Structures are given as C-alpha cells and as structure tokens.
Amino acid sequence: MPATYPEYPSSLSYSAMEAQIREFWIERNIFRKSLEKDAPKGIYSFYEGPPTVNGKPGVHHLFSRTIKDVVCRYHTMQGYQVPRKAGWDTHGLPVEISVEKKLGLKNKSHVEEYGVGEFNREARALVYHHIDDNREGWGKLTERMGYWVDMDSPYITCDNNYIESVWWALKTIFDKGLIYKDYKIVPQDPKSETVLSSHELALGYKEVQDPSVYIKFRLKDSGESILVWTTTPWTLISNVALAVGRDIDYVRVKHRETGEVLILAESRLSVLVEKIGDESAWEVIDRCKGSDLEGRDYEPLFNYFSPERRAWYVVCGDFVSTGEGTGIVHIAPAFGADDYELSKQYQLPMLQPVARNGCFTAEVPDYEGMFFKDADKPIMQRLKEEGKLYRRETIQHTYPFSWRYDVPVIYYARESWYIRTTDIAPRMVALNKTINWNPPEIGTGRFGNWLEENKDWALSRERFWGTPLPVWVAEDFAIGDGPDSGKLFAVGSVAELREGFIEIDGEEMNLGDALDKGLVELDLHKPFVDRIWFIRDGKRFNRTPELIDVWFDSGSMPFAQLHYPFENKELFDKTFPADFIAEGVDQTRGWFYTLHAIATLIFDRPAYRNVVVNGHILDKSGQKMSKSKGNVVDPFESMEQYGADAIRWYLMITSPPWRPKLFNAAEIEEEQRKFFRAFINSYNFFVLYANVDGFRYEEADIPFTQRSELDRWVLSSLNTLIAEVTSRMEQYDLTGACRLIGDFTVDDLSNWYIRRSRKRFWKGEMGPDKLSAYQTLSTVLETLAKLMAPFVPFIAEKIWLDLKSVGGTSKAESVHLADWPVADESCIDAALEERMKKAQIITSLVRTMREKAGIKVRQPLRRILLAAAEPGSRAAYELVSDIIKEEVNVQKIEYVEDEDGSVISKKAKPNFKTLGPRFGKDMKLLAEEIRIMSHKQISRLEKEGSIEIDLGGRICTVLREDVDIVHEDIEGWLVAADDAHRIMVALDTEITEELEMLGLARELVSRIQTLRKESGLEITDRIALTIAGSEKLLAAARKSESYIMDETLATSIVLLPLDDSQPGDGVEQVNNELCRLSLEKSGS
C-alpha cells in the first residue's frame, strides 16, 4: 500500500485518466464481477435494443446508452443482478443495401438475377464481419464511454435459434387466427419494392411542397365540368370515378363573361376566387344534392385504357367532406384506401399503370419509366395545354418517406400478410396504463394515441435477407382462407420443420433424415426454407415466399434472445417483463410499439415496466444534425477532447432526458470547470494535508455527537443527499439526482465545508477536532464517489481507488462493486441544515451586493440588517451569526421586524401570466390595486400565501404567485432577498477609516499567501516576512500584525518605508497603496 495519496495535476487529462481506468476494469474483470456479485434483491431485468449491425454510432447513441448505463449501474450497487446482453439487428434493408453496393446490384431484379442464395451468403458474411470486427464502431463506443453491456455473447437476430423463437411466436399468433392475407392499399417503399408497416411509416415523415391543382372533368351529357382538387396529379391517369357526398349541397355556377359552367360544393365556392375582387365573376344558377349527381358520366382525362367494367361516372362516398378542395374527390382505386373500398362497392375497374418500383409502365407510353412523383409536372402541363387545368398552386404538408432509402412512399394496391392487431388494441391500451413512462405524457399522448389509432400490422416483406414468414399454403389457397380452411398452416419450431420434405440431387426425402445424415445444413433463411414442402391430407404445401418485418425480429428479443420456449424457461420467467428499457423518442412507434404489441399478442402482458424516453440531440443552435449542414458531432472526437464522463454528466444534468438536447461544447467545458474541478479540488485538498499528517483512517471514529457543528452539518447534509438521490433514482429522475449531487459537491462541500474548515487542517497537532475533520472529509469523498459512480464512472472509480490505496473505510475492489450508500437517519439534523442553508443564502446575497457596489469581500463592513418578522427567525439567525459575519466580513448583524417598511422597502408588481387566466377582464383593475399594496399587505401575502382585495364590492383572492415582490435599496444601504427561503437582507456600504485599515490588512494577507505559493513553499513552512510600503499601508500592518502573522505562518515581520533599495519583487498596489513584499523560509 502506498505511503501517500496520489495528487492530481491542475491540467489533469480526463481522456488519459479514463484510459487508465478502462485498463483497470479489463485487467480485473470488474464488469464480470459486477454481474456475479451477491444480489440479495434478485434480478433487475434490462433489455438492450439491438442496433443495426452495420450502422454507424452517433452522439445520440452516446445519449441513450448513458441513460441505460446510469440506471443499470445504480441497480447493481443497490444489490440487484443486472444482466445486460447486447444484441445485433442483422436482417433487412440496411444489410441488403450494403451488399447491393458491394456487388454493384441496382435493384430487386438484379438481386434475383444474381441469385438469392449467393446474395444471402454475402449478407451473412457482412453481418458476422461487423460483429467480429466492431472495435472501430459499436464496440469502440461502448468501451470508450464506459457502457457496461455483455458484447461477448450477444443475441443475433439472424441466428437459427433466434429465428426459431420468432417462428414460435408467429405460430402462436397464427393459431389464434390473427394472421391473415389480404389485398389492400398499403404504403410501399418503391426503392425496395416492399410494404411498410404503420410504425415504419411513422419514422419517415417530412415537410414537403406538393402541387395543389383544380381539374375540370367534362360531363358527357352537357358542356359543363365537375371541378376536382388533388395533390397527386400523377394518380389522375388511373382515375375511374368522381365521388360526391350524398347529402352535401352542390351548385352549378356560371362565369358571367365566358359562360363556362362548373359544379362544386356550395360551401367551397371560395376556391373559385383567384384574385381579390373576383367574387362577382361567377353566379349560382342551380343547386342540388350529391345524390342528384350520382351516375352521371364524364369524359376521361386520358385515353390509355378501355376497361371492361363501367368507369368514369359519379359515385357517392361517405368519406367525402367539404373541409378542403371542392367537395368532390377523384377516385383511383389502385392508389388510395378509401378509393379501393369504394371501388368494391361500385365494382369499379382498377387501373394500375405504375410498377412496384414506382415507375410508370408501358401502359402509358408518354410517361413510361418515369418515377411517379416526377410525372406530376408533365401531367399538369399537359392538362393545362388541353384546357383541363383550372388552377395550380403549391401546398406544404407532411408526407411519408422511406425510412431507409429516403424516397417518397407510394400507396399501392397489393397482396400482403397482416397481424390483426386491431383485435387486441383495447388490451394494448389497458396494458399501457400499467407502464411507468418517463415522461408520463409520452405514454398517455404520443404512444397512447398511437395505440388508440392502431391499424393491422402489415407483416410481410418481399425481400431476401430476413426471417422467413413460416406459413405454408396449399396450391388452392386464396385470400380469405383462414387456419380452419385446411389450406394453410404455420410452422413454429425446427422439430416441426423436420417433418417436411426436401429434394437433394433429384431425390425427395424427409428433411429430418437429410439433416441427420449431414446431407444439408439447416439455415432458416431463403432459399433453404423455400425448398421445403409438406404433404397433408394429400395436398402439397409450399411456403409463402415473403419475409417478415424486421421490427418483429427486434420486438421478439425478450424471449428470442434466450431461445425461449425451447430452453431457458426459468430465466425467461425471471426477466420478463423487463424492469427497464430506454431508447429515443422515435422508438415510440418503433421498438417500444413492437415489444408491446408482441407481448400483448403472446403473453397478454406488457413487455416492460419502466421506460425512459430520450429526446433528440441537436446542435448548439437547436438545429437538427445532418452531414449536409456540417454540424454532426463525432462522439469519439468529443470524448477524446472532453472525456466521456464530462459528456455523460452534461447530457444528464442539463435537462430531463426526454427534452431535446442542445450539444454545446462551451457548456460541457463549463461543467468541467464547475463540477469536476470542484470534486477534484476537494480531493486534492484532502490529500494535500493527509499526506503531510500521515492520515490513513486507521484511528477509531470520532463519535458523531462529539464532532464540530460544521462536521455534523456536512454529514447531515450528506445523508439527506443520499436519501434524496436514492428517491430520485427510484423514480427514474436521473436529472434531478444529478443536480442534487452537483449542488452538494460545489456549494456544500467545496465552497462551504472545505473553505470553512481550512484552518482546522492547518493545525500542527492531530487533536480530536483535526482528526474529526479528516474522517468527515474522507467519508464525504468516499460516499460522493459512490453516488456519482453511475453517472461518471471513470472519475468516481479513480478517486475511489486512490482513496482506498492509502486509507478509507471501504474494501470494495471497485466503486462499482460497492454497495449503494444508505442514509443514516440518526445523523440527519434538519434544523441544523436549515439554519446553515440560511447562512449560505445570506452569504450569497451579501456577496452579490458587494459585487454590485464594487466592494471586495476582504474589505470589512460595519453591519447587515436581517428581516426577522417571523416567529423564531431571529433565534435561528443568531445560531449562525458568527458564521455569517465571518463569511460576509461584517462586524455585526442587526435584526428588524420592519412591518412598516421604514428600513427595508418592498414593492408589489402584478404577474399578468397568472392573473390573466384567473381574472380575465378584471385583471387591469386588480393590477392597479396590487401596485399600491402597502408594506404590511405585502408582508401578510408573504406569510399567508394569499390576500383578499376588494375590487368594487367583489372580493378577489390574490395568491403569492400572482405578485412579483421587489425590494428597493435605501440610502447608504443595498437590499437583496431570496423569496423561496423568505430571507431579506440589507448591507451597510459605508466604509470608515478604521474599516479601510482592516481591509488593507486582509488584502496584504492575500498577497502574501500568493507569494508563498509562487515561492514553492510547503503549506507548513514558516516564513520571515518583510513589508515595505506607504505610511498608510504600514499603519494597517502594525494594527493587524498578529492577524497577519497567524494567517501567513510568519515568525517575524519587518516593516519598512518604501524605497528602491529593498529586496523583493517589484512594487505593486494594494488597495491603491504602494507595497513591496519579500519573504524567506524561516528556520523556526
């Protein structure tokens, strides 16, 4: 064990220190030990959401992972076992896109030509390359930031065992009759040509500008036109009908000059007005109901199609409204959900001249190969040239984009498999109410509303690399056939799959036999599973070719990571539901939803009990980070520059996690200077004197009751801190806990306890008081290291290890293996804390007033006045009066009850923000009454929290929050107040000649102490001092000679008039008086 505690340089490199601690954790296997240590409270279950295996970690991941790490470290210290299994999301488009780029494949058809088997082999190789070689990506971020998660045995969504568990879940849902195939209008990603689920769709909305056009459809039986509005001109090619509201009032209007007649909803006549003053251009010539228009034929806009079914006539739809447009909707069944449902009612034809890649087909040669959104402009131009375009505008609205390819989504009629989540929506809503959401409004609002508006889950995907949908169908299967039809079934395990058949070298054989003989290797992916068929009741069943939504993969991780139900049943029962999860706000419609939906579908339980949602990270100006803006923050560069601890602390303390976070380097540096420097300086202060005195905490504890009031106060405050931080952590209020620790470290420990205890450490002998000071400060530092450990694991570990290297009371190998501190109620003295808090507040107020007046703290002043109108307030102040006088450097404290305001003047100002909503039109009259409130009325309002004001016979109750109370300075005095703690203080700013002399002496001491430090003297070294100065300065020195010698450890002082012959540094000014100081180490 070293003989001395290590000291930290003022230029401590946080990055280098963190590297040292990481090495310690690895060498000692500390993370593994934290998982294996005694856990008397059992398992605290945490689920890690799987990142995309080939994704790049960003600063937002540092944010979410800090939250996870803080909570998990805290519960480990609280006596729980907290398994933390990492995971990899390995299926779907992110991997496929990378493989396509590597192989030079441009689209889906290219992949099919290349070969699905070879393509998926490349995908698997890519996945495991990233898993095995992640030191520069996720692994580097995880280790560098101090995030403890088990990356040695992660769950991998493309693993056979994982897929088997997913298949079990799908079969369970299928057997409940909740998986079905249907033909619907679905949102589709045209780039990948695959369906998007509602939760995927929610991830990609953007603000865009689209055309807003009014089109004239000419009726066949007259020269009149029906006016229709649309924001999707490209769909007009597929128009087959116009829908009106059966009971909506429509009008025929005639243009007074041209004679043109248009038909539209009467309540939408305003759309005809192109310019101000055009109202009179049109006149109403007839009115009718929408039902009167039903069945009328019109001329198609384009002549590309000759459908067998009747088309291009007016129909009635109950979805038609007059909230926008013209009250008439153009119907293109292939591209709209309402349109499609209406087409089934009227047997309308479906014109679908757009391929799944979003491009027009050869059916419309004028636009063949053109992307659907790119066709808007040429179509509008054509309609304008043909006289069919009435007006063109631009509209700004939100529109969904592919969350992976960033291209506009197309709503498209196609077959797809669905999970009937609408059947369980009420149950999902009910279970959601049992979850503790942080913040609550996410659970009741964004997430709750999403559940209320639930749509069936579009499950299937027509891609290549993913979990195959384990449904086998007969050749005569058709949409509408259910599990009881005998035409389809689901496979839920490898054992069931082994019952199928496979062809090998032209020979058909049982799959189980083939596997047992080593003729094939099991791979639950395409194309292997597509080779397997079943024979049941004489029918052949082949697998439906689709994959499933990758979000089902990640939502299955609570059980699939354990290969449940095939093994680990007992462990699953202990870890489900999760006690805690945390991710970004965008996951409310992503992972949070899929976890919740699958858990409800299978287990009828929520998947998690507590969730912390983090907001987005923005740049320092509040802008979204993007490569194009050049404002993306590199997490590795930031951690190298500031250290991971500083960024973790900054992300936690600035605001609650769910609020948008501005990443501001200047604020990170400020937290380093404020909090980290206070903690390190407190440690350095301790070891500076402990090394001199050889303190190792080997002596018996000084009893708490025998310690000084200052020691008892800081220990009481420390135990109150433990209780309050623990309470905040149990409520998942991480920011509140962080701020409590920060305030205690800076305000109570560094700026108060240590500063007021300095003289006790300077004492030569190790008496009971000095020993008590050492033991108290050592205890505070050790306890703070524990409280800080979840938030700033590196610096907490560093100080813990360095304290433990010489002395201390804890034997834990690491602070992260130590137990969380428990508040000792017997040490808490609320009254002592309260009066010391008053002393701190008064000190702060007086120092602020000194700064305002330009008077240094070292300049003594005569007195302060404290308002003591409340019962018992004077007695409380008198208990800490000596401390206050010493801190603010005044000679005395006087007390006033000041009910009439003769000494301390108060004024009341109305708070319109609270008055307005409560008093409405009476607010102005009430504000005038508030402005003329007397001092006594204001004091009563402060004491009682409310006051009644007669407003012309009407009694109004004014609350404390309705009034801003300001305190006005009086001549020769400055006044300040802290309303929250009901403290008001006035400072006498007059400086007499006697006070000025005392101020000179104090300033001299400060300069001498600086010179001692610059001369390289030890803190215990005695000195011989020479002061040369002006007569006024020497007079001040003579008057305070004993004080100067005691403070500077001087054994002698020589006072000389100033001339150029004296040794020492150059002449300087001390409070405008010339002075030259010199000192040398004294032998005695």
Curated annotation (Swiss-Prot):
One GO CC annotation: cytoplasm
Enzyme class, UniProt record, top EC level: ligase
Residues binding ATP: K627
Subcellular localization(s) per the UniProt record: Cytoplasm
Reported cofactor(s): Zn(2+)
Catalytic reactions on record: tRNA(Ile) + L-isoleucine + ATP = L-isoleucyl-tRNA(Ile) + AMP + diphosphate
Pfam families recorded: Anticodon_1, DUF5915, tRNA-synt_1
EC number: 6.1.1.5
Keywords: Aminoacyl-tRNA synthetase, ATP-binding, Cytoplasm, Ligase, Metal-binding, Nucleotide-binding, Protein biosynthesis, Zinc
Signal peptide: none
Motif ('HIGH' region): 51-61
Sequence intervals crossing the membrane: none
Biological process according to GO: isoleucyl-tRNA aminoacylation
Domain notes for this protein: IleRS has two distinct active sites: one for aminoacylation and one for editing. The misactivated valine is translocated from the active site to the editing site, which sterically excludes the correctly activated isoleucine. The single editing site contains two valyl binding pockets, one specific for each substrate (Val-AMP or Val-tRNA(Ile)).
PANTHER family reported in the protein's UniProt record: ISOLEUCINE--TRNA LIGASE, CYTOPLASMIC, SOLEUCYL-TRNA SYNTHETASE
Family: Belongs to the class-I aminoacyl-tRNA synthetase family. IleS type 2 subfamily.
Function: Catalyzes the attachment of isoleucine to tRNA(Ile). As IleRS can inadvertently accommodate and process structurally similar amino acids such as valine, to avoid such errors it has two additional distinct tRNA(Ile)-dependent editing activities. One activity is designated as 'pretransfer' editing and involves the hydrolysis of activated Val-AMP. The other activity is designated 'posttransfer' editing and involves deacylation of mischarged Val-tRNA(Ile).
Subunit relationships: Monomer.
Name of protein: Isoleucine--tRNA ligase
